[in-house]
């Protein structure tokens, strides 16, 4: 299994290097960067196992999902202005010189690196090398300077649902195709995709997944996932641009960006 996994990683890397191209801005805000790339080698799941709900009421949310299971929410907010502001061109023009803090893309994310946002976008925001470790991969997510980025965040409309006794906190991120964060857990929250696609894998609190904290989600998907019995597989779904995933308190989750992705989470702490 390990040898097969390594061969799969090598093949995926070769495919990436051969076919990755940068596409014009169009409807992807200038972030589209994966001709065939990861879309050809690691696709969306065969069947989404997380419910999608459009125009759900607060009462329905609290009764069926808030403390029980994840759900994908559609049509609750209009973030078209925020999306336009998050285009590659607009973000570089507004925040290119700002210093951003990067974290390693592993479960514990101990290492932090500070550098200009433009340098991250132009030099580090590349498709993930499938053979690299999570603790060697730098990832822009969280650690946002809300004072410097206030002109952007003030235009975001978060999901309108709240849990009693919690306070919302934003976490904004941009990551390359094939990147992601391996399994971890924390409090409840919402995660919205602005550009790109993000594949999620989720387990309930009592079901600890098999994973290595320093290996990437991509490595887990290629090496561990195929050997899982159907009963041992996680809930999974690919979140499209404009959709919001809600995850309850202490649910294990891992993410995999299928494209260069721009996203924002609202954590309920």
Swiss-Prot record:
Residues 136-269 form the JmjC domain. GO terms for biological process: cellular respiration; positive regulation of canonical NF-kappaB signal transduction; positive regulation of sprouting angiogenesis; regulation of glycolytic process; regulation of pyruvate kinase activity; sprouting angiogenesis. Glycans are attached at residues 135, 145, 214. One of its GO terms (cellular component) is nucleus. Gene3D superfamilies: Cupin. Disruption phenotype: Homozygote knockout Jmjd8 show no obvious phenotype. However, the number of capillaries in muscle tissue is significantly reduced. Keywords: Cytoplasm, Endoplasmic reticulum, Glycoprotein, Signal. Induction: Up-regulated upon endothelial differentiation. It holds the Pfam family Cupin_8. Oligomer. Dimer. Interacts with PKM; regulates angiogenesis and metabolism. This is JmjC domain-containing protein 8. It comes from Mus musculus. The gene is Jmjd8.
């Amino acid at each position: 299994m390990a040898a097969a996994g390594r061969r799969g990683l090598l093949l995926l890397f070769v495919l990436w290097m051969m076919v990755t191209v940068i596409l014009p801005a169009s409807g992807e805000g200038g972030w589209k960067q994966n001709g065939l790339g990861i879309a050809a080698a690691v696709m969306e799941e065969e069947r989404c196992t997380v419910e999608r709900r459009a125009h759900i009421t607060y009462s329905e949310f609290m009764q069926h999902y808030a403390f029980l299971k994840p759900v994908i929410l559609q049509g609750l907010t209009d973030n078209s202005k925020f999306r336009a502001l998050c285009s590659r061109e607009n973000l570089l023009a507004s925040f290119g010189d700002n210093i951003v803090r990067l974290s390693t893309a592993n479960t514990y994310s101990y290492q932090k690196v500070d550098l200009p946002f433009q340098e991250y976008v132009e030099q580090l925001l590349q498709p993930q090398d499938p053979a690299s470790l999570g603790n060697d991969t730098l990832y822009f997510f969280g650690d946002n300077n809300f004072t410097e980025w206030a002109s952007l965040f003030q235009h975001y409309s978060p999901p309108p649902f709240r849990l009693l006794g919690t306070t919302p906190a934003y976490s904004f991120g941009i990551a390359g195709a094939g990147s992601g964060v391996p399994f971890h857990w924390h409090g409840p929250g919402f995660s919205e995709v602005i550009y790109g696609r993000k594949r999620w894998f989720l387990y309930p609190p009592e079901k600890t997944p098999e994973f290595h904290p320093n290996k990437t989600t991509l490595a887990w998907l290629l090496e561990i996932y195929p050997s899982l019995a159907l009963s041992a597989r996680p809930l999974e779904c690919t979140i499209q641009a404009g959709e919001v995933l809600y995850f309850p308190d202490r649910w294990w989750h891992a993410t995999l960006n299928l494209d260069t992705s721009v996203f924002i989470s609202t954590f309920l702490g």
